[in-house]
Swiss-Prot record:
InterPro entries hit by this protein: RecX_HTH_1st, RecX_HTH_2nd, RecX_HTH_3rd, Regulatory_RecX, WH-like_DNA-bd_sf
Protein name stated in the entry: Regulatory protein RecX
GO biological process, one term: regulation of DNA repair
Gene Ontology annotations for the cellular component aspect, listed alphabetically: cytoplasm
Major subcellular site: cytoplasm
Recorded superkingdom: Bacteria
Length: 272
């Protein structure tokens, strides 16, 4: 049995207290420290006698409280998923038993709620990014959110809203300068949008509804540029029909139409 000799406030942390225990010679020595919440909960005061088992319990309670306080600070920046909180506490080397207890308390107090987190996450991604539902789904999955909760949260991202975002992204891409054929640009845009997490069906639907027809003058200008490059590349080793075939195949792979390719061949290789 040990008796509390005195209790002092820590200089740097006013909500923490040092507990000094009485020594056999009538003096005192530092025993342990606790948070104010623990001090109040167990009504610790000068003269109180503590068994070794109780001191151990108080130290464990304080360790748990410090980890809990640390987690609240972590959550103060933004809402987190249960897995994010667990990963954070593991990095802080908190015992698994304490982690489970902290998360249980946080869920009870609504600090941690994966359904609410998923809904806020989806809305944030819709408003501040160009990501589609599949990519958002993957992000939430990596954060440990349950599949049913993800599905429910993604209801905030209906097809019509996806189409609006896809249309804006396509328009922006088509306005940028490019040395590629119109068809190749469309294919690249489709691929890019799928990588962002949009469904191919939604992308195709938007492209069909939009006026994405090629600018003939620009297409011809780009074809001539690409065609001249191919001629320069192949005419050192090929001539006649073989050269025409190489150039035609190269331009076709780049997405140009047969009519334009033939027009270029007729104009550029008429003497071959």
């Amino acid at each position: 049995m040990k008796k509390i000799a005195r209790i002092t406030t820590q200089k740097k942390h006013k909500n923490r207290y040092n507990i000094f225990l009485q020594t056999p010679d009538g003096g005192d020595a530092y025993g342990f420290s606790v948070d104010e919440a623990i001090l109040i909960e167990y009504r610790l005061s000068k003269g109180m006698e503590l068994e070794d088992e109780m001191i151990s319990i108080l130290e464990q309670k304080d360790t748990l409280h410090k980890a809990y306080t640390l987690t609240i600070h972590f959550l103060s920046y933004r809402m987190r998923s249960e897995k994010e909180v667990s990963d954070y506490l593991q990095k802080k080397e908190v015992d698994e038993e304490h982690i489970a207890e902290i998360i249980k308390r946080l869920k009870k107090e609504k600090w941690v709620d994966d359904q609410q987190f998923a809904e806020m996450f989806v809305r944030s991604r819709i408003n501040s990014s160009s990501k589609g539902p599949k990519m958002i789904q993957q992000e939430l999955f990596e954060k440990g959110v349950d599949g049913s909760k993800i599905t429910s949260a993604l209801e905030q991202y209906p097809v019509e809203e996806q189409k609006q975002k896809v249309e804006k992204l396509i328009s922006k891409k088509l306005q940028s300068k490019s040395k590629d054929s119109h068809q190749k640009r469309i294919d690249q845009i489709k691929q890019n949008l799928m990588q962002k997490g949009f469904d191919s069906g939604v992308i195709s639907m938007v492209i069909q509804q939009m006026d994405t027809t090629e600018d003939t003058d620009r297409e011809w200008e780009v074809l001539q540029l690409q065609g001249e490059k191919l001629l320069y590349k192949y005419q050192k080793k090929h001539s006649g029909f073989a050269l025409k075939q190489k150039v035609m195949e190269g331009l076709y792979r780049k997405g140009f139409s047969f009519d334009m390719i033939n027009q270029f061949i007729d104009q550029s290789l008429q003497d071959e």
